[in-house]
């Protein structure tokens, strides 16, 4: 799937569903590239917002490069990340917005979680920046690699 062929599995015929679908189309066109990804450098870290191809929710990632974080820092980031850390592989740490209380736009299960909330691009980007800020502050305000 690309940003141009948004096809939810189930389309409920109601105003809220139509509004969310239109919002996501605009969000993809405004922020995300052809791979449904947005990246930027923030305070010395590469951060990324990506759309899950199958379920449609957004995920956020921080590239720690060669940096190691300790248990205290991991726990801090886990508390700040939406729904907790769900990804930590090869010095990349991240979270997703596909929990039971979130709207997963391409999912056929949305009708079961109709009281959920769609976590938009700005929500994910701000959550990533909050995590990076906390990580930098946990090191005395200076980046320390290695």
Task: Annotate each predicted stretch with a short phrase.
Residues 2-69:
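N-terminal low-complexity, intrinsically disordered segments
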Residues 28-31, 38, 45, 69-146:
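Polybasic, proline/glycine-rich intrinsically disordered low-complexity segments
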């Amino acid at each position: 799937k690309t940003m141009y062929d948004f096809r939810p599995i189930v389309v409920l015929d109601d105003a809220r569903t139509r509004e969310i679908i239109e919002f996501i189309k605009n969000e993809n066109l405004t922020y995300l590239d052809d791979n449904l990804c947005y990246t930027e450098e923030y305070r010395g870290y590469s951060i990324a917002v990506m759309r899950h191809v199958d379920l449609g929710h957004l995920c956020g990632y921080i590239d720690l490069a060669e940096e190691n974080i300790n248990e205290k820092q991991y726990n801090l980031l886990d508390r700040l990340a939406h729904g907790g850390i769900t990804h930590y592989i090869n010095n990349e740490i991240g979270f997703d917005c596909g929990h039971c209380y979130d709207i997963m736009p391409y999912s056929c299960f949305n009708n079961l979680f109709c009281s959920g909330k769609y976590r938009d691009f700005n929500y994910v980007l701000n959550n990533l920046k909050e995590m990076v800020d906390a990580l930098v502050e946990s090191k005395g305000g200076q980046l320390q690699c290695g």
